[in-house]
Amino acid sequence: MDKKYIPSALVLYLNYFIHGIGCSILSQQVVKEMLASQWGLKDVMAVTSIAAALGLGRLISLPFAGPLSDKLGRRLSVIIGCASYVIFLVGIAFSPNTTIAYIAAVLGGIANSFLDTATYPAVTEIIYKYTGIATMGIKFFISVAQLLMPFFLGIVA
């Protein structure tokens, strides 16, 4: 393992910390209530359909995200994933209705696909002696973000 690439690995792992937040934010009751009010919905559970759009975006983009990552490079795939996550998070927070939120959530799924196709190979190449630990690090950062999210919301709300 070349130590000069450790900061790169940490940045890649940090992307998955953000991914953990993105995945769990729509499942938090406080957020559901706020978004239902923002979108003029009477039923808080209607927000769950927006969360399902994350999976749809992932399914749509997986067939081409991998080949694009191989062809254009992992760095560009990570940038596309990060940019899509920014659009997703800002779009969900400021969407005036469920249509815009659904589109933003599809972009969140696309972000996840692009990050997966670039980050997994990158961290296993950086930490090549311990590839199992390298991929477990991704799950670790997702889990830590999901663990901390309710506490962050409790402080803010």
State where each predicted segment sits.
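Helix-breaking motifs and short loop linkers at transmembrane-helix boundaries and internal kinks
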Residues: 73, 94-96, 128
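Short hydrophobic/alpha-helical segments at membrane-entry points of transmembrane helices
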Residues: 12, 99-105
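C-terminal ends and interior cores of transmembrane alpha-helices
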Residues: 83-96
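Membrane-interface helix termini in secondary transporters
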Residues: 66-67, 155
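Residue-level signature of mid-helix packing/kink "hotspots" within the transmembrane helices
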Residues: 54-63, 146-147
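Helix-loop boundary and gating motifs at the non-cytosolic
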Residues: 5-38, 46
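Cytoplasmic helix-loop-helix junction between adjacent transmembrane helices
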Residues: 106-140
